[in-house]
């Protein structure tokens, strides 16, 4: 599913071709017991599901894109919600015509390479709690352990 090398509190991670990226990141974090940190990377995909929050209705709209695209930016944070690992990842994808699409990354199927850096902030965590005003799962700093 992936290969990696550790450098201090950071991991350089390469996900295997044709794997689903979000699932691979989650599996890696679970294997390494990472409950607070960040992830960033680049790569290429053949399919991606992105999510956009419409603040007027406090509801998400998903879009599925099935085309070869470059990951021009993938960035996110790692925390927990209700004691479970919670990934909040955004991505920007470059299309063949040099336009870009982006949003909250729900899933993406790798087609080429996916090279990531995962930083582990160490023991503890920051939780998440639903905020009815925004419709978002926001940081909950009262949670300190996963």
Question: Each PLM stretch: what is its role?
Answer:
Residues 1-88, 92-146:
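N-terminal intrinsically disordered, cationic/polar leader segments
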